[in-house]
Amino acid sequence: MDTTAVASKGSTNVGSSTDTLSTSASLHPSMNAGSVNEYSEQQRHGTNSFNGKPSVHDSVGSDASVSNGHNNHNESSLWTSGIPKALEEATKSKKPDSLVSTSTSGCASAHSVGYQNIDNLIPSPLPESASRSSSQSSHQRHSRDGRGELGSEHGERRSAMDGLRDRHIRKVRVSQLLDLQRRRIRPADHTTKDRYGIQDFNFLQTLGTGSFGRVHLVQSNHNRLYYAIKVLEKKKIVDMKQIEHTCDERYILSRVQHPFITILWGTFQDAKNLFMVMDFAEGGELFSLLRKCHRFPEKVAKFYAAEVILALDYLHHNQIVYRDLKPENLLLDRFGHLKIVDFGFAKRVSTSNCCTLCGTPDYLAPEIISLKPYNKAADWWSLGILIFEMLAGYPPFYSENPMKLYENILEGKVNYPSYFSPASIDLLSHLLQRDITCRYGNLKDGSMDIIMHPWFRDISWDKILTRKIEVPYVPPIQAGMGDSSQFDAYADVATDYGTSEDPEFTSIFKDF
């Protein structure tokens, strides 16, 4: 049986939604002091609310997901275990890079920011697709066959036709792949209720804490495998009017089944608490890795973005909007693949739109800030923010002043560093599009507009989905299954789990 781990770092979120648990990142060095884009964890998770005061929810989001090693994978790391020493030395001497400032209208100006480009620290690229190489060889073949000017034109036309044909074949293959993955969903009558009890687990340590409770690393007393259990206090959920969101989280996780989404194995409750048994992700948060590296090389960011895209496409096809995409909610399993965790903000939708103001301020779409009804397109906006932050080391609209942050988002003007490739800028300009009728992911072809974008030309989507691609980073898991070294240590406190005295709210949470 495959199990994977769950514990995601919470951040200050705005609006009313299920307050899930939090786990701090391992290391968050401040970005280049004195830079016009200084950005630290404290600033990211500080006074982020519409009134400039700390949010009512001190932390929102947590789970922990990691594989227990029961899948066969043919993978090896492009990095050595852990963060290379060369990376640490390189980041000590950063040279400023110029930026190109653009908005949806294509304006440009010059700025500077001190972030070190670390592309040379990743020795090997991700595999390139066969379609790209075949197109290039076709172009070379027909160029050689040309005789004079007419022959050259003929060769160029043939090369262009071959390119269109290869693109069409690639699009058909990816469409078939997406159709297959979208059908994987648990039956509607699948239940998680009372599959386990408190007596089935040995509680080892705390992985994260939050407003509603804690996340614990546990070991099963039956199969000896490791899991993460999220414990939520019923009274706090009721007092903060989060009953519906909590029940939605349980229902959604009980239905979804995807390689890049955490698994909910079962739920149970005692008199005072709700328990959710999920994967344990031993590799820690992507946020922690990003802070250690300052920013990712393009090939690395592209790899993680591809796994997120497949997961979002799956959720959207099954009428689920995620609403809280950010590096803190992306965990690495022991093999280096992502797991999306923390579905406290996720919502089932069909033809109706969402209205709740929720999410992480830096990642909020403009339609959410404007208090307008919104749909799944908000997730694709967040994808654009995620890709930008992975490439640059900071989100595109960041400001220390919360109100200025929201103004920046509504204005939609993005400053692209000079080291961003033209393809990445083009993709981001279509994702960070204020007009949802023009935003990639929300158009006629849906996620295919993103998947088929030239920035992903060298991505083999079938290998991504089947996890048969070489990962850019393998977490340094040294103690084997159950290794929690990639998470911060928390002080354990006495708990009264398992009590049966004075049961509260049992009828409200009857599906747990």
Swiss-Prot record:
DNA repair in keyword set: no
Similarity remark: Belongs to the protein kinase superfamily. AGC Ser/Thr protein kinase family. cAMP subfamily.
Activity control mechanisms: Activated by cAMP.
Entry protein name: cAMP-dependent protein kinase catalytic subunit
Composition bias type Basic and acidic residues, residue spans: 143-166
InterPro entries, alphabetized: AGC-kinase_C, Kinase-like_dom_sf, Prot_kinase_dom, Protein_kinase_ATP_BS, Ser/Thr_kinase_AS
Biased composition (Low complexity): 16-27
Cross-referenced SUPFAM superfamilies: Protein kinase-like (PK-like)
Modified-residue entries (Phosphothreonine), positions: 356
Region (Disordered), start-end ranges: 1-79, 118-166
GO biological process: adenylate cyclase-activating G protein-coupled receptor signaling pathway; adenylate cyclase-activating glucose-activated G protein-coupled receptor signaling pathway; negative regulation of gluconeogenesis; negative regulation of induction of conjugation with cellular fusion; negative regulation of transcription by RNA polymerase II; positive regulation of microtubule depolymerization; positive regulation of protein export from nucleus; signal transduction
Domain Protein kinase positions: 201-456
Binding annotation for ATP: 207-215, 230
Catalytic activity: L-seryl-[protein] + ATP = O-phospho-L-seryl-[protein] + ADP + H(+); L-threonyl-[protein] + ATP = O-phospho-L-threonyl-[protein] + ADP + H(+)
The entry's keywords: ATP-binding, cAMP, Kinase, Nucleotide-binding, Phosphoprotein, Serine/threonine-protein kinase, Transferase
Enzyme class: transferase
Pfam family for this entry, one: Pkinase
GO molecular function, one term: ATP binding
Domain AGC-kinase C-terminal intervals: 457-512
